[in-house]
Amino acid sequence: MKVIFTQDVRGRGKRGQVKDVPDGYAQNYLIKRGLAKEATKGNMNTLKRVEANEKAAYEAEKAEAERIKAELEKDDTIVEFKSKAGNDSRLFGSISSKKIVEGLEKQYGIKVDKRKLNLPEPIKTLGYTNVHAKLFKGVEATVRVHVTEQD
């Protein structure tokens, strides 16, 4: 019996895959537990539509990530912060990824999720810092952050 897997089944198939499995296994285990459904013409058409929608959503998300990368990679895109600092250029406080995201949105209107920024520890010194951002699978950018001393 041909079935369409609705979930990953270890050793049998992945979600969205169409496979031929024994009738008893399909009816008594896979279909009963909702792990698969019978591969009828209607279900096959539904599968094709769902795959097309998922691919379109993936392409749209990747295009959006490419657009954001182009904005971030421009020479004039530098996130500016003013902060109080001591004599040794150490900040009183720090600049976290949350503040960087807020600065990007406020200064340039670019929305980026803070979890996409690779900032191992908050910025605690004056000057320029490059922060890497993984926007999408295979799409990475660098956010330039400039921290100056507040008067």
From Swiss-Prot:
What's one Pfam family the UniProt record gives for this protein? Answer: Ribosomal_L9_C
Q: Which GO terms describe its biological process?
A: translation
Source organism superkingdom: Bacteria
Protein keywords: Ribonucleoprotein, Ribosomal protein, RNA-binding, rRNA-binding
- Would you tell me the Gene Ontology cellular component terms? ribonucleoprotein complex; ribosome
* GO molecular function per UniProt: rRNA binding; structural constituent of ribosome
Q: What does this protein do?
A: Binds to the 23S rRNA.
Q: Which family does it belong to?
A: Belongs to the bacterial ribosomal protein bL9 family.
What HAMAP family does the database record attribute to this sequence? Answer: Ribosomal_bL9
What NCBIfam families does this protein's entry cite? L9 (TIGR00158)
Write the protein's name.
Large ribosomal subunit protein bL9
Q: Which organism is it from?
A: Lactobacillus acidophilus (strain ATCC 700396 / NCK56 / N2 / NCFM)
